[in-house]
From Swiss-Prot:
Name of this protein: Cytochrome b
Binding note for cofactor: Binds 2 heme b groups non-covalently.
Subcellular location: Mitochondrion inner membrane
Transmembrane parts of this sequence: 33-53, 77-98, 113-133, 178-198, 226-246, 288-308, 320-340, 347-367
PANTHER family tied to this protein: CYTOCHROME B (PTHR19271:SF16)
Known role: Component of the ubiquinol-cytochrome c reductase complex (complex III or cytochrome b-c1 complex) that is part of the mitochondrial respiratory chain. The b-c1 complex mediates electron transfer from ubiquinol to cytochrome c. Contributes to the generation of a proton gradient across the mitochondrial membrane that is then used for ATP synthesis.
Pfam families: Cytochrom_B_C, Cytochrome_B
Length: 379
């Protein structure tokens, strides 16, 4: 008799996706982050669900409801900090996952890659709206500043901003709708993740060499399930260390002050995982130009498959491209640092140079280096 996991209509889908899935035999730990992202998403939905049971999306009570969760709800503080720091873990895994895709040429699976870019935008939108919900100073002013960027859109900008706000400023209507969307989006993300996986399983996984591995596949279970569990334990260790020892390390102290529309914080800045994009936004003195640069800093990922000039897929055997990749990584870390600094000399000029370098590496230098490497190898 054939095993039920291979015949049952529903279990068969799980089997083909996680158990009998043919996987390249040489994929490294960099391929762990997909499963970790799935676990992060599940954790965020679960902790978010329990937090939503006690949270109130009203400007008068939102801040105190979060305080109530931390003080009066059984293990509410664990839920709150797991959710807040879980978002940080989510973005760490996301950026490493995207970095892996860039390094090993996984972006040549165009459907999977583009789906991933859509997912990145969706997760960023969700995280932004979630940051507004505690209704602290940085929540309020972050929401005001970022939504106000849409007013840079010619002709319809101002109307669009007021439509999103539900009034003439960030207020009760804004908070309520942000809570509604913050609750809804993770479920949409879950559906998009399934499409992402569907596209991936059409082609099969890439591997560190970038060479097709159809002749050397092994089943996902037990070889990679055990490897994923190691990654999971490592992530849980880091997350619990954050939650239990320094839960506020990645947050902003200003968010422990209730939102006050009459008092602007000295330095308005988003959570750490948006600082690189925020630095790019601030480095352009023109409002519309800044908004375009902000969107393009992420949207640029869509054109990367079309800028691939090398005859080799992966960077494993391309030392020049490797140097550029790590230069890009250092550049992004520099932008992240600059995004958290005040707008004054020398931070402004450093941010502008780092922003120019970011776009220059991706659009110009990397494709040229790919051609140079082809020439050096006489291809």
């Amino acid at each position: 008799m054939t095993n039920i996991r291979k015949t049952h209509p529903l279990i068969k889908i799980v089997n083909d996706s996680f158990i009998d899935l043919p996987t390249p035999s040489n994929i490294s730990a960099w391929w762990n982050f997909g499963s970790l992202l799935g676990i992060c998403l599940a954790l965020q939905i679960l902790t978010g669900l329990f937090l939503a049971m006690h949270y109130t999306s009203d400007t008068a009570t939102a801040f105190s409801s979060v305080t109530h969760i931390c003080r009066d709800v059984n293990y509410g503080w664990v839920l709150r900090y797991l959710h807040a720091n879980g978002a940080s873990m989510f973005f760490i895994c996301l950026y490493l996952h995207v970095g892996r895709g860039l390094y090993y040429g996984s972006y040549l699976f165009k459907e999977t890659w583009n789906m991933g870019v859509i997912l990145l935008f969706a997760v960023m939108a969700t995280a932004f709206m979630g940051y507004v919900l505690p209704w602290g100073q940085m929540s309020f002013w972050g929401a005001t500043v970022i939504t106000n960027l849409l007013s840079a859109i010619p002709y319809v900008g101002t109307d669009l901003v007021e439509w999103i706000w539900g009034g003439f400023s960030v207020d009760k209507a804004t908070l309520t709708r942000f809570f509604a969307f913050h609750f809804l989006l993770p479920f949409i993300i879950s559906a998009l993740v399934m499409v992402h996986l569907l596209f991936l399983h059409e082609t099969g996984s890439n591997n560190p060499t970038g060479i097709p591995s159809n002749m050397d596949m092994i089943p996902f279970h037990p070889y990679y399930t055990i490897k994923d569990i190691l990654g999971l334990f490592t992530m849980i260790l880091v997350l619990l260390s954050l939650v239990l020892f320094s839960p506020d390390m990645l947050g902003d102290p200003d968010n422990y002050t209730p939102a006050n529309p009459l008092s602007t914080p000295p330095h308005i800045k988003p959570e750490w995982y948006f600082l690189f994009a925020y630095a790019i936004l601030r480095s352009i003195p023109n409002k519309l130009g800044g908004v375009l640069a902000l969107v393009l800093s992420i949207l640029i990922l869509v054109i990367i498959p079309f800028l691939h000039t090398s005859k080799q897929r992966s960077m494993t055997f391309r030392p020049l491209s490797q140097c550029l990749f790590w230069l890009l990584t250092a550049d992004l870390l520099t932008l992240t640092w600059i995004g958290g600094q005040p707008v004054e000399h020398p931070y402004v000029i450093i941010g502008q140079l780092a922003s120019i370098l970011y776009f220059l590496i991706i659009i110009v230098i990397m494709p040229l280096v790919g051609l140079v490497e082809n020439h050096l190898l006489k291809w």
